[in-house]
A protein has these predicted regions:
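Secretory/organelle targeting and membrane-embedding segments
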Residues: 1-145, 149-487
């Protein structure tokens, strides 16, 4: 890995940069993964000075630094340029600053660009980086872009085309912070390093897979953005389908980025494109209505600030995906994601097929649960015997949870992903083929929903979504394993 690099952050005054990027860069610096041969150029429209920018950086890492001196030494590597992304003259000044810092920090012409801005500016920035020779083929040149990567296949394709005019596919890192989470990356270990699971990870033994992304909060201050996006675009097109690909892929030939990508790509290629009838049967949308939780009243989605009072945007999405592969043909991959649900949490449940009863005693299916957030860990439910003289069965659970100390020591997702980019490891990033396939599927669902050909189910705040989501699983003789509203 080369830690000799000039990092340029477009959108350096924004919330993401201050909450995530500067702390993540500091952790890399503190651990020695960023050497003294680095500098960060922050650009944004605000007319900040270098001194003020340094103070913003110091404030963002105040809880992480061992001393004020350490924080200030780190911040001294940060430089600021007020920048209008559509003004060519500003790129000329940026090139001059880049060249100066490259010489000052002996960065060997290595460049990393992070676009922490609205996607409509990505193409403009990439075009100017090339035309003003900031991207010049010297050293490594890598680009990190934030989601959302388009709003449908057409916009994503145009965005990709614009980036490819300056960068090669192998230089583009489409970030999905969920893929940087420690427990997501442990899925490989759970699956492929344990004979117990690897030999039964198929349709012969697995009845269904359940993926839940639950949020307790509403849309908060994101009403304007969310009303143009909705749960399907915001959570399913990226996080859900990326997680599904890790759960459904075959074992790669090796654990190199190319072999892992190849197996993930096969999952996206084999996603079944549902018919119009299946779209109506197997995909559910919902929107939270007003209500009370523990005596406190919460407003409906349509009453949220910056939301259309007649909005049909979904705050809840649920459905069943299928994969036409030898491993998982006919196995439903259920998903649900929503706002204002009972409890915040991201869980995966692998529900194994139910065995026949023994001695007249009904058996519950074995379930492997992968906890991704807020706690991390796994549990495996088994059928055991109650203590006593009679042969009565009772469920038992084998649990492993990461304690708070260990969780705190795990790399932040952005820290891990920036480290991967510096190491030129694109394993935990979305390749264009994956993005394209996911949008093709999401567009089919969105087309039907935008025409209001399926009901928009209301659900009470504090629930786990509309009843239709539970009825969906009942069609397959299944039920949601995680039901915190009944705990």
């Amino acid at each position: 890995m080369s830690s000799k690099v000039i990092i340029t952050i477009f959108g350096a005054s924004g919330d993401l940069a201050q909450r995530k990027l500067y702390p993540s860069l500091f952790r890399l610096y503190k651990s020695g993964n960023l050497s003294k041969h680095f500098a960060v150029i922050g650009t944004a429209r605000r007319p900040w000075s270098k001194e003020y920018f340094e103070s913003v950086v110091v404030e963002s890492i105040s809880d992480l630094a061992d001393s004020a001196e350490q924080a200030q030494e780190f911040a001294s590597h940060f430089f600021y340029q007020s920048h209008d992304v559509q003004d060519t003259e500003h790129y000329i000044e940026l090139r001059k600053l880049q060249n100066k810092l490259n010489d000052q920090y002996q960065a060997e012409n290595n460049k990393l660009f992070f676009l922490s801005m609205a996607p409509q500016f990505f193409g403009t920035i990439a075009k100017h980086l090339k035309s003003e020779q900031i991207v010049d083929g010297k050293g490594f040149e890598r680009l990190i872009v934030e989601k959302p990567f388009g709003t449908d296949l057409a916009t994503a394709s145009k965005l990709n085309e614009d980036l490819l005019a300056t960068f090669d596919e192998e230089q583009i890192f489409r970030i999905d912070h969920y893929l940087g989470k420690e427990m997501i990356q442990k899925i490989f270990a759970i699956r492929f390093a344990n004979l117990l699971f690897e030999n039964v990870w198929n349709r012969q033994y697995i009845d269904n897979v359940q993926i839940t992304f639950a949020e307790k909060l509403g849309v908060e201050e994101r009403g304007g953005y969310y009303d143009q996006s909705g749960a399907l675009r915001d959570m399913v097109q990226n996080h859900t389908l990326q997680l599904l690909s890790l759960l459904a892929m075959d074992k790669p030939k090796s654990f190199t980025k190319d072999d892992i990508r190849a197996e993930k790509a096969k999952v996206f290629e084999r996603l079944v494109q549902p018919s119009k009838e299946d779209l109506k049967r197997f995909f559910i949308r919902g929107q939270y209505k007003s209500g009370k939780i523990n005596g406190r009243k919460y407003i409906s989605y349509r009453s949220e600030p910056n939301v259309n009072p007649e909005s049909t945007t979904e705050t809840f999405a649920s459905g069943a995906f299928f994969i036409d592969s030898d491993r998982f043909r006919d196995v439903p991959f259920f998903f649900r994601t929503g706002k204002r649900l009972t409890k915040k949490g991201t869980h995966v449940n692998i529900v194994f097929k139910q065995m026949d009863s023994i001695f007249g005693e009904p058996l519950k299916p074995n379930v492997l649960t992968i906890y991704i957030q807020p706690t991390e860990g796994i549990s495996l439910s088994l059928n055991g015997k109650e203590v006593g003289e009679l042969f009565n069965l009772a469920p038992i659970s084998l649990d492993y949870r990461t304690d708070a100390t260990a969780s705190g020591a795990s790399p932040d997702p952005y820290e891990k992903l920036i480290f991967d980019v510096l190491n030129n490891d694109s394993t935990n990033f979305s390749h264009w083929d994956e993005v394209k396939a996911s949008w093709e599927l999401i567009d089919r669902i969105e087309e039907l929903w935008s025409q209001n050909q399926v009901p928009l189910h209301e659900y009470p705040v504090g629930s786990m979504g509309p009843e239709a989501s539970f009825e969906l699983l009942a069609q397959f003789g299944a039920s949601w394993q995680w039901q915190p509203d009944k705990e």
